[in-house]
Amino acid sequence: MYSLGERRVEIKAKDYFIAENATVIGSVIVNNNVSIWFNAVIRGDNEPIEIGENTNIQDGVVVHTDEGIPMQIGQGVTIGHLAMLHGCTIGDNSLVGINAVILNNARVGENCIVGANSLIPEGKEIPDGSLVLGTPGKVIRKVTDEEIKNLKLSAEHYVHNFKRFKEGLKRIEQLKDMQQKKIIGED
């Protein structure tokens, strides 16, 4: 984690997980049970970024803002691997699929699914309870009650998963140590 001038990361959480190689810079607010996974970059260098409780930001995600366009990620949100979020708002209990892109001033409502590889252009409003697919993203249909249940389960899974990682993740320091402990065999 890094400060940038007066912009500082604010941890409002009793419990959270930020992977060692994730980068969190500037005005970023991390709430309870947030997990920020490996190689994610959260850059609050221009405007604040707030990440709601029980939200997970998966491996390789980039979150950034432009001046005058702060960012809000709601509670219980799942941001899939390699997604790109830029100056947008994501409602509670939504999922942004793998490699999706959401641009400045776009608003994704609550209980939404933005499919993998979808693009939500600048200023686009996605109503609550929508399934969005494509480039540019289009509302295909309303999400089902079963899908809403699964959105909640996804967020809960990542809360349990980060606790497992906090407890059990250990760095393997040197190859020599690995060989001595017979974790790997010699050639």
Region roles according to the model:
Residues 1-13, 45, 53, 59-60, ...:
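Glycine-rich hexapeptide-repeat left-handed beta-helix
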Residues 11-65:
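A positional/architectural concept
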Residues 68:
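Short, Lys/Arg-rich nucleic-acid/phosphate-binding segment
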